[in-house]
Amino acid sequence: VNTATLPPRPGPARIALLGVLQILSWGGSFYLLGVLADPIAHDTGWSHQWVLGGASIGLLVASLLSPRVGRLIARVGGRKVIAAHGLIMAVGLAMMALAPNLAVYLLAWVVLGAAMATGLYDALFTSLGATYGMQARPIIVGVTLISGFCTTVIWPLLALMVHLLGWRGTCGAFAVLVLVALFPLYRLALPEHVNAPAHQRAEQGAGEPLAPSIYWVMTALFAIAAALMTCISIVLLTVLQARGHSLASAIALAALVGPAQVLCRVIDLALKRQAPLFTALLSSGMTAIGLLVVEFVPSLVAWGLVCYGAGNGLRAIVKSTLPLVVVRPADYAVVSGRMARPALLAQAVAPIACGYLISTLGSEAMIHMLAAMALLAFGLCLWLARLIAQRQALHGQAAV
């Protein structure tokens, strides 16, 4: 990236603002049902499967839209797209608040799926990567440091709102909040224009700029890592309780994951010029080691979860920066949008698959499968490292 053509990088205040806005973005969509699922089911009589299925529908819609969103960011810049995300989310939440039946509730999740596609990590980090190239890394890490506290902030807030307003009032109030906050503040925090090469590249409709083998291995790695994270967030408490832990003990153990995620991001930010490929190997390796410890060494389950949390904490950074090793910033938005589709689709299917596996094979089989997925992700990362090394040797590039 030619730094002379770049807009000024956001300072600490704008990075912190982006982190806070991401808390609202995630809290009004992906994490919404963590608090609202039970109140919605109890009030309406709709089954929990259908209530929770709304989130899967939203993720499915996001997966279908992500390549188009990537092309749109390449063409018009992330500022307009991500600011519009606030308007779309407000519409979806308002529809949910007013939903007279299950069909309208599920339609609201279709709209929220469009909001997720245009404003969560994939869209934001795609915009930053396309604009700043590798210089986006400290911005991305800084945003994840703040947004990593999303559930810590949002779930108690949503619980209080449900207590005071009911679930419909909570959706309505949150719709107003994101409408007045996200649209104007994203426009304030993000640069106004994409750089010219990215704009020209999008207009010319350039094809896939990297080797198919690297593209597909990287895409598979991101999809498996996303599915793994989603599965663990769903089944961790169930697996721990099946192994003899009380609910209170299981919650305490699961709570170790969040601080470990944030701590590893602080360390990554302090180390500054960490090579993305090294970070990817570290992330997938620590995730695999952590889950193997959870699987085979029950007495060290706490350390296993800390190790898993540290590896998973680097995942968002890896997903945003690793493609820049092999993709020019001008092509980054389009490629990143394409890569996001399988990962989002895996996240949409994960809750259904987890429920089926636990009900048919049991929690022990579930933890075996999760450890196997983590090992597969690490193997793909090693394969990717070899492919990138071969590519760099062929083109005489420096190692990453």
State where each predicted segment sits.
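Hydrophobic core of transmembrane alpha-helices in multi-pass small-molecule transporters
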Residues: 23, 103-119, 144, 223, ...
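Intracellular juxtamembrane helix-capping segments at the cytosolic ends
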Residues: 40, 118-132, 314-327
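Helix-loop-helix hairpin linking two adjacent transmembrane segments in secondary transporters
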Residues: 142-193
